[in-house]
């Protein structure tokens, strides 16, 4: 049994970026999320933890309406996005607009069959940016923010598949950053990577927390403790406990949360 | 507790079983023969075409064959220029591909990226039905329906034309192109599409900018297959394009293709061994080389744009 050292040395913000109100989600007839209430604070890292099948990825994917891509999925409740104070789950909201502002990085690195440059420029190009000078500037910025610029600056024309797994994942982060999203969603971003690449991605997430609001799903509790400011523990589609990461990891209120964090189950 | 005695087996239990070994070898041999047979037949056809063509080229120089602009092997004033047949083949194929490739691709994009499950399940069998119609039916469809229809727009169109044959051939090839293209696009993993959607791309942008480049090798294979079919198609052009070997580049004229010429001579009463009869082997060899070029091209494309996910 081990108590993990929580992330420290950076200020907790209490500015609300997003508020989740009574969120229910259904895959056809199956209810995957039950009555979830949660806060997402601006420029903070919020980790979603819990055993497999608890609904943490499902919850994350609600934030950029990824469930709209498949038939018979159905949301109830609200995810309010500030400063608009609008419910992004409302049928009047265009999921494409939501995804323009809330971007996502996936479990498995998924670069497109294009050059490194075109991968990062993709989000800008689909928004109609054509000026070469603007593209070059934004691509360089995104690659710098993703800590990849130094490694690829001399081979921006190479196919993205030629990069290593960790580099591909940082490229996907650069791709998501290029369009200046307000919230960045990470769905187990290191589960397909080796320990060294994992460390570099975690470091990157720590660096990014001052620039963008981050939500991260992780199986790895040490990772949640290391990178996050807030932690939500989920079980069977419900949010069991939510609070500052220090509190959740050192003195959780709920017995179930404590059991999971200390490795007694899950 | 007694320690189990490991040496207490009947001796020789580890020895190779000859019965099993023999059975495996027989199966291996049968599989090899099946594979060998198809390769053997291919080479036999190539051997036949080349050896018979050599007889033809003893009478006609390769230079004349490739440059003469007339193809009249059955006339008293015989000319043996393959160009008129090649032009007929090229024009009818071109017309067919102008129809089949864009429509096939559009249908594939719709079915793979846009169509709801039920629509796809209903539409695919119908498309495959289109591919199952005998080509002779397409030929008469071209001659008796499409040509008169075209004549209302183009009054100068003759009763036999490459245009009409090519159009119908294009319709005929659409299912081949669309079904192979769709398979290639559907095999692109979902997580690649999600990566595109997740940063705000529309379905169309995702289809054009991510899914199509990712499945390029499969799409290239589909196009090559379409081209090969158009070049090798016989019945539709034989019925609807006329059989006069004309060196034309205008689709609104009647002309013969390589395949229709071979049919014409095979069904005729030319004596075997005459130069006139040998022409069909030279024509067949030309056709084989043409399709070979496309297959090699397809192979190179596949290697160039190999899928890596």
UniProtKB/Swiss-Prot annotation, chain A:
Gene3D superfamilies, A to Z: P-loop containing nucleotide triphosphate hydrolases
Keyword tags: ATP-binding, Cell inner membrane, Cell membrane, Membrane, Nucleotide-binding, Phosphate transport, Translocase, Transport
Keyword Isomerase appears in the UniProt entry: no
UniProt xrefs under SUPFAM superfamilies: P-loop containing nucleoside triphosphate hydrolases
Keyword Transport found: yes
Binding site for ATP: 50-57
Catalysed reaction equations from the record: phosphate(out) + ATP + H2O = ADP + 2 phosphate(in) + H(+)
Primary enzyme class: translocase
EC number(s) on file: 7.3.2.1
Cell compartments where the protein resides: Cell inner membrane
PANTHER family: ABC TRANSPORTER I FAMILY MEMBER 17
Family to which the UniProt record says this protein belongs: Belongs to the ABC transporter superfamily. Phosphate importer (TC 3.A.1.7) family.
Name assigned to this protein: Phosphate import ATP-binding protein PstB
Gene assigned in the entry: pstB
């Amino acid at each position: 049994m081990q108590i993990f050292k929580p992330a420290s040395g950076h200020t907790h913000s209490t500015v609300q970026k997003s508020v989740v109100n009574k969120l229910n989600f259904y895959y056809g007839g199956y209810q995957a999320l039950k009555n979830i209430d949660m806060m997402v604070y601006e420029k903070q890292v919020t980790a979603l933890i819990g055993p497999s099948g608890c609904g943490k990825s499902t919850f994350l994917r609600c934030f950029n309406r990824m469930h709209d891509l498949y038939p018979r999925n159905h949301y109830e409740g609200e995810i309010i996005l500030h400063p608009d104070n609008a419910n992004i789950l409302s049928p009047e909201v265009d999921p494409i607009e939501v995804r323009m502002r809330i971007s996502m990085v996936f479990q498995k690195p998924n670069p497109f069959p294009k050059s490194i440059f075109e991968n990062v420029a993709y989000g800008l190009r689909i928004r109609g940016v054509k000026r070469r000078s603007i593209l070059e500037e934004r691509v360089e910025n995104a690659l710098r923010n993703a800590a990849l610029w130094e490694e690829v600056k001399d081979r921006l024309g190479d196919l993205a598949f030629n990069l290593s797994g960790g580099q591909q994942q940082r490229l996907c982060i650069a791709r998501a950053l290029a369009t200046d999203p307000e919230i960045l969603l990470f769905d187990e971003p290191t589960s397909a990577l080796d320990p060294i690449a994992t460390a570099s991605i975690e470091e990157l997430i720590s660096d990014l927390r001052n620039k963008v609001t981050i939500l991260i799903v992780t199986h790895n509790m040490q990772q949640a403790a290391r990178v996050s400011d807030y932690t939500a523990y989920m079980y069977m589609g419900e949010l069991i406990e939510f609070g500052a990461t220090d509190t959740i990891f050192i003195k959780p209120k709920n017995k179930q949360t404590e059991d999971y964090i200390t490795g007694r189950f899950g | 507790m007694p320690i189990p005695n490991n040496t207490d087996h009947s001796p020789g239990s580890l020895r190779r079983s000859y019965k099993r070994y023999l059975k495996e070898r027989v199966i291996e041999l049968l599989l090899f023969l099946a594979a060998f047979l198809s390769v053997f037949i291919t080479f036999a056809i190539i051997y036949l075409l080349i050896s018979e063509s050599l007889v033809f080229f003893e009478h006609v120089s390769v230079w004349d064959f490739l440059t003469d602009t007339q193809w009249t092997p059955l006339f008293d004033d015989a000319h043996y220029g393959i160009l008129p047949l090649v032009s007929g083949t090229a024009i009818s194929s071109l017309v067919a591909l102008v129809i089949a490739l864009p429509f096939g691709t559009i249908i594939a994009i719709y079915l793979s990226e846009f169509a709801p499950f039920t629509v796809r399940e209903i539409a695919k069998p119908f498309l495959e039905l289109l591919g199952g119609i005998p080509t002779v039916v397409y030929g008469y469809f071209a001659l008796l329906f499409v040509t008169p229809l075209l004549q209302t727009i183009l009054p100068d169109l003759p009763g036999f034309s490459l245009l009409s044959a090519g159009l119908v051939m294009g319709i005929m090839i659409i299912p081949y192109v669309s079904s192979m293209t769709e398979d290639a696009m559907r095999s692109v993993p979902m997580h690649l599409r999600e990566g595109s959607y997740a940063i705000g791309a529309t379905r169309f942008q995702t289809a054009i900018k991510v899914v199509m480049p990712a499945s390029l090798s499969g799409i290239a294979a589909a196009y090559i297959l379409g081209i090969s079919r158009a070049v090798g198609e016989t019945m539709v052009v034989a019925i609807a394009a006329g059989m006069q070997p004309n060196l034309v580049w205008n689709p609104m004229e009647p002309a013969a293709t390589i395949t229709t010429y071979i049919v014409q001579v095979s069904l005729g009463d030319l004596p075997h061994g005459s130069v006139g009869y040998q022409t069909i082997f030279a024509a067949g060899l030309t056709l084989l080389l043409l399709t070979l070029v496309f297959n090699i091209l397809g192979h190179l494309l596949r290697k160039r744009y190999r899928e890596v996910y």
